[in-house]
From Swiss-Prot:
One of its GO terms (biological process) is phosphate-containing compound metabolic process. It comes from Arabidopsis thaliana (Mouse-ear cress). This is Soluble inorganic pyrophosphatase 5. The keyword Magnesium applies. The gene is PPA5. Its EC number is 3.6.1.1. Mg(2+) 1 binds at D102, D107, D139.
Length: 216
C-alpha cells in the first residue's frame, strides 16, 4: 500500500426518512401530466390539410429497419428488420389525427432528397394514392412530396414523377414481405384527388373516434 495507512470505513447512519419506492401507477399518472406529446394525437395535422399536412416520419429513406409508432406510449419502436435485401425507397410515416379502418393513422410515403430521422415531422403535399392490399386487407399509401424540399416542392401530381421512380416504389411494396410468405398486391397509382379524399375521410374517422371517446 506504499506505506499509506488504510482507514477503516465508518458505518453510515441510517436515513431517518428513507426515499419511498416509486409506485408504477403513480408514476404513470404523473407522466400523463408531463409536457411529452403523443405524435398521433397531440401534433396538429396542419391548416392546409388535406392537401398539405404534417407527416411524422417512422422509417428513414434507405433503412432496412421497420420502425412503427407504439400507439400506447407514442414512441417509435422497432417492429422488425426486413427479411429481404430491399430498403425503404423514401421516408415513410403517418399523418397525425387521422384514422383508417385498420385502427392506424393513414400511411404516407414522402419523396424528398434526404433521409429524415424517425420521430421527426415535416410538411408534405399529397400527389397521388397507391392502392394496396396487404394479406387480404386494404392498406393504401398516400404518395407525397416534402413541400420544404426545393427539388420536389413544385410537384403536384404523381404523373410528374419519372416512371422509373413509380416502378421502384411499386416493386418495393410488392417484394418487401415475400420472404415472410406474406402476400401484398399493389394496384395502379391514382391521381391527387383520391389521395386528398382518403386523407379527408381519415380525418373524419378520427374526429368520430375522438367524439366517441369523450362521450364514454
Amino acid at each position: 500500500m506504499n506505506g499509506e495507512e488504510v482507514k477503516t470505513s465508518q458505518p453510515q447512519k441510517k436515513l431517518q426518512n428513507p426515499t419511498p419506492r416509486l409506485n408504477e401507477r403513480i408514476l404513470s399518472s404523473l407522466s400523463k401530466r408531463s409536457v411529452a406529446a403523443h405524435p398521433w394525437h397531440d401534433l396538429e395535422i396542419g391548416p392546409g390539410a388535406p392537401v398539405i399536412f404534417n407527416v411524422v416520419i417512422e422509417i428513414s429513406k434507405g433503412s432496412k429497419v421497420k420502425y412503427e409508432l407504439d400507439k400506447k406510449t407514442g414512441l417509435i419502436k422497432v417492429d422488425r428488420i426486413l427479411y429481404s435485401s430491399v430498403v425503404y425507397p423514401h421516408n415513410y410515416g403517418f399523418v397525425p389525427r387521422t384514422l383508417c379502418e385498420d385502427n392506424d393513422p393513414i400511411d404516407v410515403l414522402v419523396i424528398m432528397q434526404e433521409p429524415v430521422l424517425p420521430g421527426c415531422f415535416l410538411r408534405a403535399r399529397a400527389i397521388g394514392l397507391m392502392p394496396m392490399i396487404d394479406q387480404g386487407e386494404k392498406d393504401d399509401k398516400i404518395i407525397a412530396v416534402c413541400v420544404d424540399d426545393p427539388e420536389y416542392k413544385h410537384i403536384t401530381n404523381i404523373n410528374e414523377l419519372p416512371p422509373h421512380r413509380l416502378s421502384e416504389i411499386r416493386r418495393f411494396f410488392e417484394d418487401y414481405k415475400k420472404n415472410e410468405n406474406k402476400e401484398v398486391a399493389v394496384n395502379d397509382f391514382l391521381q391527387p384527388g383520391p389521395a386528398i379524399e382518403a386523407i379527408q375521410y381519415s380525418m373524419d374517422l378520427y374526429a368520430e373516434y375522438i367524439l366517441h371517446t369523450l362521450r364514454r
